[in-house]
Amino acid sequence: MDLIIKEKRDNPILKRKEIKYVLKFDSSRTPSREEIKELIAKHEGVDKELVIVDNNKQLTGKHEIEGYTKIYADKPSAMLYEPDYELIRNGLKQKEAK
């Protein structure tokens, strides 16, 4: 997989970095959210627990994903600013049974 950073912005008020990227991949299947999270964490040199994969858009007819990710300075900041559904999707919170 080839990660291309299109835009990187520091957001000190929310204690996070915001990254827009293009991910090119060779396999016949689209990479999972967890695989993307690990790749970005490795690329940025942070713990994968601090990476929130917010948005992924598969480009039709191409082996590419355009995405938006947030990297928090610490876990409490992520828990404070992210909505519950994003925390559940990214494995930072467990879904409550009804």
From Swiss-Prot:
One biological process term in Gene Ontology: translation
What Gene3D superfamilies does the annotation carry?
A: 3.30.70.330
Q: Which GO terms describe its cellular component?
A: ribonucleoprotein complex; ribosome
Q: Which UniProt keywords apply?
A: Ribonucleoprotein, Ribosomal protein
Q: Fetch the Pfam families from UniProt.
A: Ribosomal_S24e
Question: Which Gene Ontology molecular-function terms are recorded?
Answer: structural constituent of ribosome
Q: Which family does it belong to?
A: Belongs to the eukaryotic ribosomal protein eS24 family.
Instruction: Tell me the protein's name.
Output: Small ribosomal subunit protein eS24
UniProt source species: Thermoplasma acidophilum (strain ATCC 25905 / DSM 1728 / JCM 9062 / NBRC 15155 / AMRC-C165)
